[in-house]
């Protein structure tokens, strides 16, 4: 005992008992040449990193797979990988994530990806799902845009057995040009280019060669990258003779590649363990390395180049590195189509039945929504399945990644979903007359975002809200956040809303902030129904019990007063107990929302992935006819637009779902005025998902 006490005193005196954080980043090299460059990298970084900063070390392995295992096990910390290896690194049990991405092009126009597209001649009449029996042109065997992506996406349509893959592809197309394929074993793959020459000197090799195969060699479709046709045909009139095949089995002009591509091919990425604190150290080293040893910075050592060989540690063609947003995992980095293509080829497992008969997997928030979804699933005879998530953004993420298929969102979250590549499919409609006359408008008429106060508070108005207590439906939601905070931002010109209001409840805001002070839980300030003040009714209850102003939809007060809400907090409330704040500084009764509102907002809308949109629309059209025939029929049986608590899965005041015109974009649905409002507050956004989804667009 005496020895233990003495040892502790000695430790304390010497400071040895304090854990010293490990600031060493161990880079993994896969060859002798890479390791030699890594050692030079290490030595040069010593001269430019601060004395108390991170340090670089090198670990040599013999393969990317060994490096991935070493990083996962803590023996190494980082390595740069191409997309296929990023996929492997992200899988369990490796669980690595991208922390930085190489970019190409220039500092002014950094490119972290290119797009794989399918080009066809204008005037032909087939779609992506009708390629069987056509003649195909590929950049080369095993290449991303020309083979991995198109064959991966077509994999489940290939005839069985699908091994060897080349044989299945040869049977699927009536003839092909696949440079580098074996002309003896698979002669049909070389039918359009005898010998399947594997050299850039061959006429049909590579991107330009695959397009020439389409143009001059008898092909029906060419799998290339989005810039290829612009390089070969600089004149628009010439390009207009060609079209792109889209994932949703439509066609678009070749200059609309952003809306019609097979997959995004991401740049090489630096990967690391998820959440052990090394990401910041890795980025600090890379940031300093670029500044001192990037393109054209130093003759002594070049980060993106080496006399020892090609593409050591980083690609020689890289112009620099960008930090990847913290929310981005390997799936968001690679994109759903890329992940699907690789997974199909690696695992060789295809779902039973086609996408046209598959159930729709709905994403539910919280236990209450999941309970309603499960009831819907049982009633739907297998047409609906359920997936759960803790937040709306988590649900959007799951839909993007194919773990779920659809959900209904307010405009603010529909904007985020749109930025993540999802599309609007059907709109909630709150006007029974336009349900019975669906042609009256292309899109259902929107609702009003309003600011509600207590009539007893005579001093409050739109211009003196500073220091008041605010109640919001949730961060990034339309009526409760984007519209009022966008208007506020244009006035105060900063994003410190938690300093503008004295207290508030804004579910989804930073925890321990004053804008979570008024929230009641049980999951305090959570952006779901586990926060009692979440949503329209929750924000109104917050006003009744604690707040000075609530930002909600125009129907909220009407739905919760004059006996329409029998909950203890609402049963005695009267409409005249509340007023609306008008932007001109006046007030009006809650029934005069048409002339006293902050803005008109788009109705909530069902979103899905492009390739799933048609199926979602078909299933929902049948489901709404089965499970909603009006309030009077909504007794005893499952009802789509009725909830045990407020607004589960859909708004309870929904009268029908209106099908949107095919190809409607989120920008078209939300409208220019609303997009401008969201744009105003974009710089204040705390959405990590939005940051991740726009990374490859920046």
Swiss-Prot record:
Glycan-linked positions: 512
GO terms for cellular component: apical plasma membrane; basal part of cell; basal plasma membrane; basement membrane; cell surface; cell tip; clathrin-coated pit; cytoplasmic vesicle
One Pfam family recorded for the sequence: Transferrin
Covalent S-S links between cysteines: 28-67, 38-58, 137-213, 156-350, 177-193, 180-196, 190-198, 246-260, 363-395, 373-386, 420-693, 435-656, 471-542, 495-684, 505-519, 516-525, 582-596, 634-639
Database matches in SMART domains: TR_FER
Subunit structure: Monomer. Part of a complex composed of SLC40A1/ferroportin, TF/transferrin and HEPH/hephaestin that transfers iron from cells to transferrin.
Name by which UniProt lists this protein: Serotransferrin
Species in which this protein is naturally found: Rattus norvegicus
Lineage: Eukaryota, Metazoa, Chordata, Craniata, Vertebrata
């Amino acid at each position: 005992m005496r020895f233990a006490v003495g040892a502790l005193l000695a430790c304390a005196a010497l400071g040895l008992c304090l854990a010293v954080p490990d600031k060493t980043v161990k880079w993994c090299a896969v060859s002798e040449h890479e390791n030699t460059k890594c050692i030079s990298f290490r030595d040069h970084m010593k001269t430019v990193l601060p004395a108390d900063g991170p340090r670089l070390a090198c670990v040599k392995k013999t393969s990317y797979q060994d490096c991935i295992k070493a990083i996962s096990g803590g023996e190494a910390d980082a390595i740069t990988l191409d997309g296929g290896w990023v996929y492997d690194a992200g899988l369990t049990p490796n669980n690595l994530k991208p922390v930085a991405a190489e970019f190409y092009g220039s500092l002014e126009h950094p490119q972290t990806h290119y797009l794989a597209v399918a080009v066809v001649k204008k005037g032909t009449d087939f779609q992506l799902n009708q390629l069987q029996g056509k003649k195909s042109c590929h950049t080369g065997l095993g290449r991303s845009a020309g083979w991995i992506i198109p064959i991966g996406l077509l994999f489940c349509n290939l005839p069985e057995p699908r091994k060897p893959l080349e044989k299945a592809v040869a049977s699927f197309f009536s003839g092909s040009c696949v440079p580098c394929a074996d002309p003896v074993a698979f002669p049909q793959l070389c039918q359009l280019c005898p010998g399947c020459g594997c050299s850039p000197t061959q006429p049909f090799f590579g991107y330009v060669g695959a397009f020439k195969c389409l143009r001059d060699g008898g092909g029906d479709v060419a799998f290339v990258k989005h810039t290829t046709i612009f390089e070969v045909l600089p004149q628009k009139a010439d390009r207009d003779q060609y079209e792109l095949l889209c994932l949703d089995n439509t066609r678009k002009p070749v200059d609309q590649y952003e809306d019609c591509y097979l997959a995004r091919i991401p740049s090489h990425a630096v990967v690391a363990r998820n959440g052990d604190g090394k990401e910041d150290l890795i980025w600090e080293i890379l940031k300093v390395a670029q500044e001192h040893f990037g393109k054209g910075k130093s003759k002594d050592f070049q980060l993106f180049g080496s006399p020892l060989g090609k593409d050591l540690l980083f690609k020689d063609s890289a112009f620099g590195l960008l930090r990847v947003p913290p929310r981005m995992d390997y799936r968001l980095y690679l994109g759903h189509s890329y992940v699907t293509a690789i997974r199909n080829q690696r695992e060789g497992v295809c779902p039973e039945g086609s996408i046209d008969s598959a159930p729709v997997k709905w994403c539910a928030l919280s236990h209450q929504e999941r309970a309603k979804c499960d009831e819907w699933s049982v009633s739907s005879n297998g047409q609906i399945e359920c997936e759960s998530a803790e937040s709306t953004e988590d649900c959007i993420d799951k839909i993007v990644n194919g773990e779920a298929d659809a959900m209904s969102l307010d405009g603010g979250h529909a904007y985020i979903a749109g930025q993540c590549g999802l599309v609007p499919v059907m709109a909630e409609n709150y006007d029974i007359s336009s349900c019975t006359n669906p042609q009256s408008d292309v899109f259902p008429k929107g609702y009003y975002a309003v600011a509600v106060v207590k009539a007893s508070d005579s001093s409050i108005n739109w211009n003196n809200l500073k220091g008041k207590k605010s109640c919001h439906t949730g961060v990034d939601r339309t009526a409760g956040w984007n519209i009022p905070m966008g208007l506020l931002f244009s006035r105060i010109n900063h994003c410190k809303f938690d300093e503008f209001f004295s207290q508030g409840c804004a579910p989804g805001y930073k925890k321990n902030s004053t804008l979570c002070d008024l929230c009641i839980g049980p999951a305090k300030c959570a952006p779901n129904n586990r926060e009692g003040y979440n949503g329209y009714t929750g924000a109104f209850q917050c006003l009744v019990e604690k707040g000075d102003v609530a930002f909600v939809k125009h129907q909220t007060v009407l739905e919760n007063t004059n006996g329409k809400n029998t909950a203890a907090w609402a049963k005695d409330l009267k409409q005249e107990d509340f007023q609306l704040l008008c932007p001109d500084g006046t007030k009006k009764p809650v029934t005069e929302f048409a002339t006293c509102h902050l803005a008109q907002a788009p109705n909530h809308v069902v979103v899905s992935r492009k390739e799933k949109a048609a199926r979602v629309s078909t299933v929902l059209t049948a489901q709404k006819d089965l499970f909603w025939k009006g309030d009077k029929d909504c007794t005893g049986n499952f009802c789509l637009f009725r909830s045990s608590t407020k607004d589960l899965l859909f708004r309870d005041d929904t009268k029908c779902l209106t099908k949107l015109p095919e190809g409607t974009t989120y920008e078209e649905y939300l409208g220019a005025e609303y997009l401008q409002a969201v744009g105003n507050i974009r710089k204040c956004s705390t959405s990590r998902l939005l940051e991740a989804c726009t990374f490859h667009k920046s």
